[in-house]
Regions:
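Short charge-dense sequence patches
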Residues: 1-11, 48-52, 109
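Short acidic-aromatic low-complexity motifs
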Residues: 2-34
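A beta-strand edge to alpha-helix "cap/lid" segment located at domain peripheries
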Residues: 4, 53, 59-120
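Residues at structural and domain junctions
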Residues: 13-14, 38-41, 88
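Short, flexible active-site loop motifs that bind/organize anionic cofactors or intermediates
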Residues: 14, 18, 42, 99
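A solvent-exposed, acidic/Ser-Thr-rich amphipathic alpha-helical stretch
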Residues: 25-77
Length: 120
């Protein structure tokens, strides 16, 4: 399946906001390449769908009620793009913010670079 960069950026936020492990894994299998890499500035590098699933689940377990919301439209350039987002409990002020940069290959995410930002 081939996805646009904008869709991939938004669906990546869904992965980290999903509480149901089976649904999260289904999205991971759909939007990430088998050899994908996730660069987390605080926790290191995660390689492959299994590791991305594991870290997304671990993050969600520490903040089960947090959701990720884009704060601007995605920026796209060639096979890459970025999206700025905030995360927190619905109905409350955001707890933290970040920017995800992705590189896509054949309609799937091959790499995600996470940057934490100051709250807007």
């Amino acid at each position: 399946m081939s996805n646009s960069i904008s869709i991939l950026l938004r669906r990546n936020l869904d992965v980290f906001g999903e509480n149901d492990p089976a649904r999260r894994r289904a999205v991971i299998d759909e939007i990430f390449t088998e050899d994908c890499v996730f660069y987390d500035p605080n926790n290191g590098i995660y390689r492959g769908r299994d590791e991305i699933d594991r870290i997304a689940g671990a993050i969600k377990a520490t903040r089960p009620d947090f959701q990720y919301q884009p704060i601007v439209e995605p920026d796209v350039s060639g096979d890459g793009g970025r999206i700025q987002w905030v995360s927190g409990r619905p109905g409350e002020a955001p707890a933290y913010a970040g920017t995800d940069f992705i590189v896509a290959r054949e309609g799937r995410i091959a790499a995600v670079y996470l940057f934490f930002d100051k709250l807007p």
